[in-house]
C-alpha cells in the first residue's frame, strides 16, 4: 500500500509549476444565476482606449484573463452583457475574485434578448470533443439518440451505443447513469433533445474513471432555467413494424425553478410487441440440421427520473439529488422446428417471462467553485432484481421448467477535491464500491450463487498549462478489489491490486488545428453479471453459462485525436489487450452448443476514424459524414479455443454513415441517413456486412411551434438481415436473423412554458456560418 501511494505521489510531484499572472472570477446575475458569454475587457488604467486582454465568460459564468504576456501591474476591467449594466473595476494583474461578480439588470424591459458571442460549434479541449447540440438538432421532435447518431465518433444501433468501439459511460448533468444498455437506450430514446445544451465526448479514460466499464464517456448537459417558471413537454410516439409488430409510448418532461430550488421530473411508458425469426443451419454426423425459431415478445417498460438541485446561500454550494426507477416486464412465446435433411424431427414451444426492476439514487454535495478550491462528496445506491421463468414443451412429450431469480445492490461512496491555480489544476479523489449479487435456480439443487465485490479506488491527477496553447495532463489511479464467492455452500476469495498511469497532451496549434495525444494502461476486470454461473437456454441445442473464474485483462492504449478547421475530427490509435476475456463458443460432452465468457487470447487493434460536417445554401442544407476503420489481430490463444477459430490476423472492418438534412423553413425539415458496415471477422465469428437507409421529416405548426410532428421511416428496403457464422470447433453454424427494423414511426410533441425571460444565443457568424446558421 505504501509503495503504491509513493508511486502515485512521485508521478504527480513534477506537475507543480511556477504560475503566471491571470485574473479569474465568475459572473452571475442578481439571483446568483451564472451568466455565459459576458464580455470581459482589460484596458490600461492610463489609456482606456488601449485593450490589453479580453475574453468571454464560459460554462458556469467563469472566466480567466491570461496576463502573463503583459507588463501592466494593474488593469481596468469592463464587464458587459446585453440586458445588464456594465461593471467597472481596477484590479491587480494577478487577481482572483473571491466572490462572484453580480451584474445588475438593465432598466430596459426585456422579453427576448439575442446575444452574439464567440462560440465554436465543435471544440477539442481537455481531451474532450465538445458539441453545441443546437447544430445537431433537426427540430422539436428529436430525441437524445437522434442527436447522438449525428455526433462525431458515436455509433447508435438498435441495441447499443459505442464510441470508437467502446461502450460508453453516459453522464447527464453530472449524474452517472448506472443502468444496463437496454434500459439506457429506452430512456434516451424518450428524452427530448430540445432539453440539451452541450454534448461532450471523451473517447479515452482518465484517472477519474474506473478501471473497468468506463473506456469512453458521453456527457450530456441540459438547459437550465434562467428565471422562475416551468416548462412541460410531452411526446407521444407510435411505431408500426413489419408483420403486425408495433411499439408505442408516451414521455413527459417537467422542468421548473423556484428560488434556490430547481429540478426536472420525467416519466415514461413504452409498450411493444415485436416478432422475431431466426434460422440456423449446421452439419451434424453427415446430416444437414436446420432449426427455425419464430417468437413474439410483448414488453411493458416503465421509468421515472427525478433530478433536483438546492442552492441556498448558507450551504456555500449545492445539494443535488437524483433518483430513477425502471421496470421491464417481458413475455416471450416462441415455436421452434428441428429438421434433419429436410425431415421434421420435433416441434418445441418455449415461453419466457422475465420481470426486472432497477433503482438508482444518488445524493451529492458540491461546494461553490471559489476558483481556487472545490470539493464534492456523494453517496449512491443501485439495487435491482430479476425474476426469470422458462417453460419448454416439445412434440416428443418432454417438458422442462426453469425458474431463476437474481437480486443485488451496490453502494457507491465518492469524494473529490480540486485545487485550482491559473496554470495548474490538481485533483485527488476516492471511490468505493460495495456490491453483492445473488442468483438462485429454483429448479436445481445446490445452484445458489452469491458474490461480494468490494472495490476501493484512489486517484490523483494534475493538469499543467505549459504555454498558452499547450497543456499536459498526468494522472494515476490505484484500485484494490476484494471478491468473495459462495457457490454450492463453498466459499472462495480473491484479491487484486491495480495501478494505472495516464498521460494526455493537449495542443492548440492554431485556430484551425487542435490535437490531443493519449497514453494509458490499465487492468480491466469483468463485470459480475458475466460471472454468474446459471445457465440460460435459447433453444434445445444451445445455452449460455457464466464463469465465476474470469481473470482481469491488461489494456494499453495510444491515440491521437485532431480537430481540423474547427469542425473536422480525425483520430488514429492502437490498443493491446493481454489475456482478453469475452464470449467463446463451445460444445459440451452431450454435443450441445454453449457460450461461455473466458480469457482466451491477446488482442491487438489498430483503428482510425473521421467525422466531417458540412453546410450549404446558407445553412439550410446540413450534414455530416462519419467513417471508421479497424484491424484486429489475435495471438497467444487459449488451448481450448484454438481448434475453433477463423482468421487470427489482419481482420479488417469498416462502417460509416452519412446524415443529410434540408430545412427550407423554420417549421419544416427532411433528412436521409444512409449507413453501412462491412464484413466483421472475429476469432470465432464472421458477421456479414449490411447497408441500409433511414429517412424522415419534421413539421411544426406555423403559428404554434410548440406543437410539432415527426415521421420517420427506418430500413425501408428491409436490408438489415443478419447473417452470422459461428465456429464451435467440431462444426460451424450459420445463423440468419430477420430483425424488426423495417418500420414507420410517427411522433407528436407538445410543450407549454411559463418563463419571465428567455435569452437566446446566436453564434458568431465568422466562426460557424460554414457549419450552420
List each language-model region with its residue ranges.
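Short, acidic, small-residue-rich periplasmic hinge/interaction motif at the N-terminus
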Residues: 41-43, 78-84, 96-135, 156-158, ...
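Short, acidic Ser/Thr/Gly-rich low-complexity loop/linker segments typical of extracellular
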Residues: 46-62
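N-terminal periplasmic accessory domains that precede
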Residues: 98-102, 144-147, 184-186, 211-236, ...
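Extracytoplasmic beta-strand/coil segments of soluble accessory domains associated
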Residues: 145-180, 208
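Short acidic/polar hinge/loop motifs at secondary-structure boundaries
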Residues: 177-204, 252, 304
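Face-selective signature of the C-terminal outer-membrane beta-barrel domain
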Residues: 301-330, 349-488, 492, 506-516, ...
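Outer-membrane beta-barrel signature, preferentially recognizing the C-terminal barrel domain
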Residues: 493-494, 523-571, 576-578, 594-607, ...
